[in-house]
């Protein structure tokens, strides 16, 4: 029987691992990866929303 683990090479997999093991390093890495994945930045998921918030200049709400 195979165990399906999240792919640490993707932002979603990295975020899932970070949340599962409560490791902020994985979570931050996932957010930074998502900032670079422009085609996925508008996807409706937590990691995309956090990445968009980090990209907005401070003091500028959109």
UniProtKB/Swiss-Prot annotation:
Q: Name one GO biological process term.
A: negative regulation of cell division
What sections of the sequence does the record tag as coiled-coil? none
Tell me which InterPro entries the record gives.
DicB
Q: Which keywords belong to this entry?
A: Cell cycle, Cell division
| Its job | Involved in cell division inhibition; this function can be repressed by DicA and DicC proteins as well as antitoxin CbeA (yeeU).
Q: What is this protein called?
A: Division inhibition protein DicB
List the taxonomic lineage.
Answer: Bacteria, Pseudomonadati, Pseudomonadota, Gammaproteobacteria, Enterobacterales
Q: Which gene encodes it?
A: dicB
